[in-house]
């Protein structure tokens, strides 16, 4: 583990301090870092460890990830010119169905690396070709674009296109994102009950099987899905305690907890955090699949980490293979581009365009002459406005300020993120978060023999005015 960790993190942010921690723990355990022999035939356990580490390192250098080339893309190129988020709109996009890079004054990536004056490249569009852990070739489709192969496991089919038979669903889906960004203000009166009594417990067999079915699954204006929760704790038989919180706090905490941005684990890392939470719970017993003899801590950790890692690796290969092939646009690009074109709901209203954004009263409207957003010379009249999170320009000090929600020009819409990151640098379809999370949740269920957290309840605390980093909060 020491050799592999030292190799894997040698180019990471704060690599020197990370290595110092590895060195300190290795020494504390009584091991000699200067012993580098791989001759395990001598019977040396340390040599065997070094040999296994070198095998893993060598395998990684030829597994298709292009580690030797700093994981750079070998043939993928974006079709769209970069969007400059600090400028209004999205005037230069050429294809509303394809991914668009962002041009940022400074980009701080998911690992905390600062890249000045950068348009970050698509992260992992060729990842479908990485050697998987357990994915089957029977589930593999190999596509070609520009003479290059794109490997796709478990192909879900194409997402809606702006100019295809599902154009209305394309518009609806991205409009939902804009509308749900209106839920990010703790000052509004909306409360949500977030205990297991209300959230979750939706049968996977009842998930929508069509794009059109999403309209019935998600609540467009209020947020949420049809999950019915559980009235009683399956371990104790007692009712779950209700937890009413401001919707704006819950939505912001949820967004930042799962954020792909700097100073955050990526979703696979979150699931290791959840596994550690389970491991450390006083009610948990280490029995593989919940049966048989108790395992010691080391055996359990090796098996659990190995199985979870394999599943998350395959989730990445599958999801990023899909992302690379379908190369789908992200919300900030689509929302701004549609709004630039106008509104697509009513040909009798101003700014009608068939490929514009749909109108939803109270959330997506047209600026009229009496609107505070009309401009000093009415230059914004006829443009699209959104009732949404107002964006980073309303935050001077993230420790004290809250951008809040209000009417803004759609040309200035931002997702809830920091301006040095904005949105993850890869295609929006298919969801990596969902793919990782479903895979990890199923694995934890199989590992522990229980689909619930120990004691039937898992808790995560987001302290008032401390947890959020994009802006101040949560408020309670």
Predicted regions and their residues:
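Acidic/polar surface patches and capping/hinge elements
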Residues: 1-476
């Amino acid at each position: 583990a020491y050799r592999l960790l030292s190799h894997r993190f040698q180019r990471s942010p704060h690599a020197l301090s990370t290595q110092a921690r590895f060195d300190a723990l290795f020494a504390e355990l009584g091991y000699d870092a200067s012993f580098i022999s791989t001759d395990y035939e001598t019977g040396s356990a340390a040599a065997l460890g070094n040999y296994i580490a070198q095998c893993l390192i060598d395998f990684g250098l030829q597994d298709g990830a292009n580690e030797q080339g700093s994981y750079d893309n070998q043939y993928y190129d974006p079709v769209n010119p970069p969007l400059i988020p600090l400028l209004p709109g999205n005037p230069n996009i050429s294809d509303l169905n394809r991914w668009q890079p962002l041009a940022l004054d400074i980009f701080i990536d998911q690992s905390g690396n600062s890249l000045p004056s950068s348009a970050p490249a698509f992260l992992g569009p060729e990842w479908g070709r990485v050697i998987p852990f357990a994915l089957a070739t029977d589930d593999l489709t190999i596509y070609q674009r520009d003479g290059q192969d794109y490997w796709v496991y478990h192909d879900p089919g194409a997402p809606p296109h702006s100019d295809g038979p599902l154009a209305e669903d394309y518009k609806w889906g991205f409009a939902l994102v804009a509308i749900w960004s209106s839920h990010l203000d703790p000052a509004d009166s909306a409360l949500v009950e977030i205990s297991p009594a209300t959230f979750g417990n939706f049968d996977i067999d009842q998930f929508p099987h069509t794009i059109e079915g999403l309209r019935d699954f998600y609540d467009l204006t209020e947020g949420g899905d049809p999950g019915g929760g559980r009235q009683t704790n399956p371990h104790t038989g007692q009712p779950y305690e209700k937890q009413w919180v401001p919707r704006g706090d819950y939505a912001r905490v949820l967004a930042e907890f799962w954020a792909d941005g700097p100073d955050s684990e990526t979703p696979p890392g979150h699931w290791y955090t959840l596994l550690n939470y389970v491991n450390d719970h006083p009610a948990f017993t280490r029995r593989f699949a919940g049966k048989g003899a108790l395992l010691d801590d080391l055996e359990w950790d090796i098996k659990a980490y190995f199985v979870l890692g394999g599943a998350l690796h395959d989730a990445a290969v599958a999801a990023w293979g899909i992302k690379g092939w379908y190369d789908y646009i992200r919300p900030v690009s689509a929302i701004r581009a549609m709004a630039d074109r106008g509104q697509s709901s009513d040909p009798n209203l101003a700014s009608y365009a068939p490929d514009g954004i749909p109108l939803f009263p109270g959330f997506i409207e047209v600026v009229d002459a009496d609107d505070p957003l009309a401009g000093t010379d009415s230059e914004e009249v006829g443009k699209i406005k959104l009732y949404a999170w107002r964006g980073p320009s309303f935050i001077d000090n993230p420790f004290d300020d809250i951008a809040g929600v209000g009417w803004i020009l759609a040309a200035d819409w931002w997702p809830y993120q920091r301006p040095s990151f904005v949105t993850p640098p890869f295609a929006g379809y298919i969801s990596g978060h969902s793919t990782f999370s479903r895979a990890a949740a199923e694995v934890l269920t199989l590992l522990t023999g229980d689909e619930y957290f120990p004691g039937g309840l898992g808790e995560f605390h987001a302290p008032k005015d401390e947890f959020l980093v994009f802006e101040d909060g949560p408020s309670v």
